[in-house]
């Protein structure tokens, strides 16, 4: 029993470290707390299947699309948390933060750019939120292409966006680069089209009622 307790404690510490390293905006997000409503296009059985993380081992891409406030960020982070529980390294970030991170590292000219690129390319599960909320530069388009090229068929990726893939195209500098990036993300991806009420308003009303 003591050995089992020690093993469980070690595992808990590993999970806690993975959650910390993932840099979730909401570290408490978990699939158990995902809200399923009649007017919300989110299937519990599908989320539970994704939470088993088999698709991560297959290096698949999951794309979550919804308008602002529908809870896509929570769902994405909940899936990331499920991966951490299975001892899978995760990184949560926003596309704008990736661009800023790489731009600063490139300007520093101290070798950190290559280290950061390697980290984005190699983490087992990369969660990219707010994808193409704003247009990205030619240089950042190249960065994104290099990341997705390295991950394709080797690492799993989740993309969360307010926009459909055909709208991403208009926010990437260069037609050829846009084609190359979208082909690696959108083709063959699993899609979750999340529609429903504004979840911020839903929880605000719920708190007032309580």
What are these regions (language model features)?
Residues 1-26:
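Interdomain "pre-motor" coupling segment immediately N-terminal to P-loop NTPase/helicase cores
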Residues 29-51:
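N-terminal pre-Walker A segment at the start of P-loop NTPase domains
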Residues 51-59:
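Phosphate-binding P-loop
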Residues 59-75:
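Walker A/P-loop nucleotide-binding motif
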Residues 61-63, 125, 156:
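Residue-level preference for the first positions of well-ordered beta-strands
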Residues 81-93:
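Post-Walker A helix-loop "phosphate-sensing" segment adjacent to the P-loop in P-loop NTPases
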